[in-house]
Amino acid sequence: MVDGVPAPPGTVQAPDPSIGTGTGPSSDVASGLGPGRVVLVGAGPGDVELLTCKAARLIGEADWLVHDALVQPEVLALARRARIIAVGKRAGNPSARQSSINQILLDCAQRGGLTVRLKGGDPLIFARAQEELDVLHAAGVPVEVVPGISSAQAAHAALAMPMTERGRRRALVLATPQVHASDQRNTAALPLPVMPPPMDLQQAAAPVPPSRRKVLSAAEIVADPELRRWAEAIVAAGSGTLYMAATVSDQVRDTLLALGMPPETPTLWMVDVSLPEQAMVPGVLGTLQPPPAALKGKPALLLVGVVPPDVRRTEAP
């Protein structure tokens, strides 16, 4: 991190010298006197004050810290002794491959000490945690998961609106409409990595072009029983929260309408949830559009069917 700005993907660095040496594990640990362990930690929605006490403690104790792009500089500043490795993934931008991230975690564990895998929000919600857990378990690495406040929770808290309500909202739907080229591939038979020899961490974290996504029409989604499940769940519940929907808002709109959701259903884009620059863009499903251009590239949630009547549009900066 330089002048409070997090490193780009592919960077291996120490924190600012004023807050720690960032040298990684001590020589005793690195020499193999104790096995390394990995903890998947939720960094919360953004506001550093929404970090859990346990998460803050582990970040401060970490020897290696492998973090996503959405983790705020104020959170990274808590890593007073860790070697920091940025492996952020952002839609449409070069990022580290998931397979490379898996190998980095294995290598850090082999080198000893505590590795914190820091993920935005909660590490078990749309964060590809299962792939990392599978690899770590297969290699015999001790692993733990520390939950975090999800962006969906923070969004509803910002609205002072419960996610469930007795007699009205009996189901809670968190979904993503994104479809990747590898989603239909059977990965069950693929061999899981074993503990690798030490590698060049900076080379392993090097960014590559963004992964290929399938751009499907609403008709294709509706015709596929598996791909339409997220939409069926929202229609059945009458409401839901969508992650990673900003680049496929047309498909979201058309799919929900095709499955019978009323066009007057309220919608609300929430951007930079929990941060001072948080923005809200209300609308209705029938005319749903992506967030304004001024908010493009920022983390956004789409709330469907749960917007309180007194929400007023927050103009984009």
Enumerate the predicted regions with their spans.
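Short gly/pro/ser/thr-enriched loop/turn and capping motifs at secondary-structure boundaries
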Residues: Q72-E74, A91-P94, S150-A154, A171-V173, ...
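Short, glycine-/small-residue-rich phosphate/pyrophosphate-handling segment
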Residues: H156, A160-T187, K214-E220
